[in-house]
Amino acid sequence: MKNFKIEAVIFDMDGLIIDSEPLWKIAEIEIFKEVGFDFTVEMCAMTTGMRIDEVVGFWRKKLNWKNFTTNEIVYKIQTKMIQLIKQKGKLLPGVYSALNLLKNNNISIALASSSSMSLINTTIETLEIRSFFNIVHSAENEIAGKPNPAVFLSTAKMLEINPDKCLVLEDSKAGMNAGLNANMRTIVIPELGTSPQWAKKGFKCLRTMLEFNLDLLN
């Protein structure tokens, strides 16, 4: 079996494994409307990749909401997201083949997401990919979400692999910065059809997961 410089690949979830960013937009716009605020798609984009409690906290502070607590709004959004994932969740192109490629080459595989464990579990069970992952970890258990590197550093610790031997796959700016802040090789796969300037800070930028290959581990 070939030896690689990289010993583990850590996947983000939303927008990388599952095409969930459109679902987050639906859930956020619907629930924010319930609390009396007309939220837009452009506003959703401002907090992509952040933990949902931090998203809600950001907008509560900015817009001075007082009629619902952060926890109440978070619960409503997460409940809606679980429903949407079960109804509409699907793997993004190339994910299954990338997971198979890594597993067949004995590379450790982890998932480190800003989403809650309930959302992570719903997603990987709905998509039937749980068996691929050695470790599944949520930033809800950390002091802060991405771009703070804590979720990636904790995942590496659980894998018992040094951060510089880990490769992160991300789609968002916050996630990319979290990977870089963790001193991990970070590959960006941004939203399909986009080529944001910030993505050039990563080790490499791929158009889709279909471009993933073992050469990226050396």
Model-assigned labels for residue ranges:
Residues I17, L91, I109-S113, A144, ...:
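Conserved SAM-binding loop
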Residues M1-E7, N100-K103, S116-N218:
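Asp-based, Mg2+/Mn2+-dependent phosphohydrolase catalytic module
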Residues D12, D38-F39, R51, N162, ...:
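Short coil/turn motifs that cap or connect alpha-helices
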Residues K25, I29, I52-G57, V74, ...:
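An amphipathic alpha-helix signature
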Residues I31-F32, R51-K66, T123, T155-A156:
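Helix-loop "lid/cap" segments that line or gate small-molecule binding pockets
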Residues F4-K5, Q83-L111, M117, N121:
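Short, acidic loop-to-helix structural element flanking the phosphoryl-transfer center
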Residues M1-A45:
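Active-site neighborhood of HAD-like aspartate-dependent phosphohydrolases
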Residues D38, R60-S97:
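Metal-dependent phosphoesterase signature
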